Regions:
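N-terminal auxiliary segments of SAM/dcSAM-dependent transferases
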Residues: 1-17
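Conserved alpha-helix/loop element of class I SAM-dependent methyltransferases that forms part
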Residues: 26, 35-56
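Hydrophobic beta-strand segment of the Class I
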Residues: 27, 121-122
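Class I SAM-dependent methyltransferase SAM/SAH-binding core
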Residues: 57-110
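A short acidic, Gly/Pro-enriched loop at the edge of an enzyme's catalytic core
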Residues: 109-120
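A short glycine-rich, Lys/Arg-flanked "PGG" loop and its adjoining helix->strand segment in the class I
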Residues: 134-149
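C-terminal alpha-helical "lid/dimerization" subdomain adjacent to the S-adenosyl-L-methionine
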Residues: 156-208, 212, 218
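Core SAM-dependent methyltransferase catalytic element
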Residues: 206, 212-236
Length: 236
């Protein structure tokens, strides 16, 4: 079954932008509902791995409504949140208390910063949405400082076949239903499974990071691999 919002290639960005524009106002509510609030715990693990010290520079890509960016800022980092969805950034801007973080509209495949700019580069639920996840990794590596931490939270593919089948059924049935009830848009949430089918997931991302000469590349799985963090450090 095709999905309104999933298209391969160059049209991908425009379609994903339409998707997030359609759900921005209810995005946080539906995240809480479909993950039973667990996404907040997973994001706290991202923040812990970031090991923020006062004054470090952090970039949160595909920042959405700002959960990760705001948490990094609360711990003393100087944070830039980047997303290409203006409606999502509008929600993020309403949530911030002061000048930090700075939220900007931009493309994670063409990050508007010089090489070696950030101590911490994070991305939550963004990598599988990019037209090229490999190019996304390359851009994250480029803007990270030597020794900088790169941390990616994303939907995963469980290794256990039975659990994977049950999980994919949940994504196919329950999640779009939640989207329809609370957002009037089932297709936007059916997109999660469609995009995940085309995404190689956590083990392939870790292998690619090692191939790119990241150090300390590792995977932290949650819920038997249904969610995962890819963590690595830029060599140098």
């Amino acid at each position: 079954v095709s999905n309104t919002f999933y298209v391969p290639g160059e049209q991908r960005a425009a379609k994903v932008n339409d998707l997030f524009a359609s759900i921005a106002r209810r995005y946080d509510l539906i995240n809480d509902l479909q993950s039973f609030g667990l996404h907040r715990h997973w994001k706290r693990r991202v923040i812990a791995l970031a090991a923020v010290t006062t004054g470090v520079r952090a970039l949160d890509l595909c920042c959405g409504t700002g959960d990760i960016a705001l948490s990094l800022a609360e711990r003393g980092a100087e944070v830039t949140g980047l997303d290409f969805s203006a409606p999502m950034l509008a929600v993020a801007g309403q949530r911030k208390r002061g000048a930090n973080p700075i939220f900007i509209q931009g493309d994670a495949l063409k990050i508007p910063f010089p090489d070696n700019s950030f101590d911490i580069v994070t991305m939550g639920y963004g990598l599988r949405n990019l037209a090229s996840w490999e190019q996304g990794l390359a851009e994250m590596q480029r803007v990270a400082k030597p020794g900088g931490r790169v941390i990616i939270l994303e939907f995963g593919k469980p290794a256990n076949a039975l659990w994977r089948s049950l999980y994919f059924t949940h994504l196919q049935c329950s999640v779009p239903l939640t989207g329809w009830i609370f957002c009037g848009n089932s297709q936007a949430y059916a997109y999660i499974l469609e995009s995940l089918k085309h995404y190689p997931a956590q083990l392939a991302v870790a292998a690619k990071m090692r191939e790119m000469n990241f150090s300390q590349a590792r995977v932290i799985n949650f819920m038997g691999g249904a969610m995962a963090i890819n963590y690595a450090v830029k060599a140098g």
